[in-house]
Amino acid sequence: MSGILGCFSTKIGMNQFERALQTMAHRGPEGCGVEVLPQVPFGKTVFIGHRRFAIVASSDAAHQPMRVDNWIITYDGEILNYKELRQGLEAKGFSFFSDSDTEVVLKSFIAYGPECMRAFRGMWAFAIWDESAKQLFLARDRFGIKPLFYFSNGEDFAFSSEIKALLLLDFVPKAPAIDGIKSFLLWGPPEYKSDTMFSGIKKLMPSHYLLFELESDGSLSDIKITKYYSIRDKIQPKNTGITFPEAVEQYRHHHRKAVEYNLVTDVPMGCALSGGLDSSSNVAVLKSLLEERSATNMREKLVTFSAVYLNQPDRSCDESVFINRLSNYLGVTNKQVEPTSDCYIANVEKFLWHQEEPTGGASVFAGWCVAECISRNGICVCLDGQGADEYLGGYHSFIGAFLVQNSFLFWKNWPFLFAGNNSLSLKKAIMYYSSHSFSKISKRRFFRELTEQFGLNSSVLEE
């Protein structure tokens, strides 16, 4: 994790920019770099900053912002296949002065332009300033693992890893986005929109890049935002002709390969362990890979981290039994935290300062507690199990989506099930539809339309 910041403006100086960059010191405690590029004919100044947290190539040669000829990059991320990409660039005649993936990203862009990201495996948020063309390129990884925000008023422009840094720049308004707040209260976090809770500040969405340039009169050109990747293009149903056991074996192979790619690090590494299938699989594969690399004393080499709920009135979400069982079976160390209500009250200001926007549930705070525990234990890189529920259908809400697609017999027989105002069938249907599928307002609207369409007694809903 690192922090990136940049702006194009006539309104701020070096002191203000450095103060804004300092708000992200936690993202890069190992160093700080700033590049100042006065655009003399235009009266604007380009500031490009970086807070460094190195997990690959920690030498000074990898210092950022990094310049190669007319191109300057500030980069937060990790390209897992950077060594292979470097070999390809060397074959094209490129030479390298560092062992960093930062240099590989920059020279890949010089060689291929935005198309370079098609070959990247990993996570990234970066900005490249082309001093010759007076052009800025911003990009974010396919799934939005790395954060990237920006602000533009047509005259000034800024980008950052975190909102708080933008708010310290004079030309960025310090005001709430009322429509964004209303939308959050009605529908939950705007995960699939570029809006934030702050006026004028946008997210660069996952799988997108942004491009603009300084015009001859010093004004900013229109911002062009392009989507460079769509997962739909990769998952269209195909008749592969393979059996279910063959599909399982392919999945196992790809999962193991993904974990292996994430071992590209020069610092201590841990693994999150929730007790579920996804994180448990990660821990088992990670331990196996480390053993293959002849790592000694595995109990010391691999540490796992978990959130547990041992002292809660409702222990239905506590998975400590599975966590302890797997830790003992694999012989790995496990560190546990318990995110209680008292813990939340004691840490709410710090949590919100880091989170910056409202969250959709308490699980985000639990994740924050685990991350803090990881940091306290000196672990710099931690493998997590995020994403498995999305592509393996692990959420209750997917039941509703399945029904809406008209692919389930239950949905086709909907009117028949409620014939004669059968309250028992209705209750079963409501349970089947899943109480986790929609927000309260969405469910209320759905059931209101249901009663009107089929002439049902609304008192059934009150039960």
Describe each region flagged by the PLM.
Residues M1-E349, W353-H354, G367:
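Cysteine-centered catalytic environments shared across enzyme families
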Residues E155, E213, L310, N324-E463:
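Glycine-rich active-site loop/lid subdomains used to bind and stabilize high-energy intermediates
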